Amino acid sequence: QWRHRNPAVSSVGRLDKETSGLLLITDDGKFIHRMTSPRHHVAKVYEAVTEEDIPAEAVELFASGTFMLNGEDRPCAPAVLEILEPRRARLTLTEGKYHQVRRMLAAVGAPVASLCRISIGSLHLDSLNLEPGEWMPIRPDAL
């Protein structure tokens, strides 16, 4: 349905069906590229609740730029992991590999129970005052 619009509308990145949070939708392909390409280093921040305690050594491991996910031929770009509680963390990425947050946390023994993307670049979900499923137009200068 979205692709049949003129101009076509696409999302800036994706969220899997088990993930909630901020999703941008636009008809500007250059904007999508600017926001999603690892070359532009646009931060995407996620909050995760895990089924097991998150090991402290994961902070340094994720930041190292040497962390490899199964099935990948390149290591993950350095990521910032903040452990908020033993089973709750905030993870900042500048790339978007398939199910990356879930795979990274599972690889260190802390499978994700719930996941929410809380920001993309300078746009923060909590500042938008939106309920789940609500949407609003955003001016390009807000990003």
Task: Give each language-model segment a name.
Residues 1-143:
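Basic, flexible Lys/Arg- and Gly-enriched helix-loop patches that mediate nucleic-acid binding at interfaces
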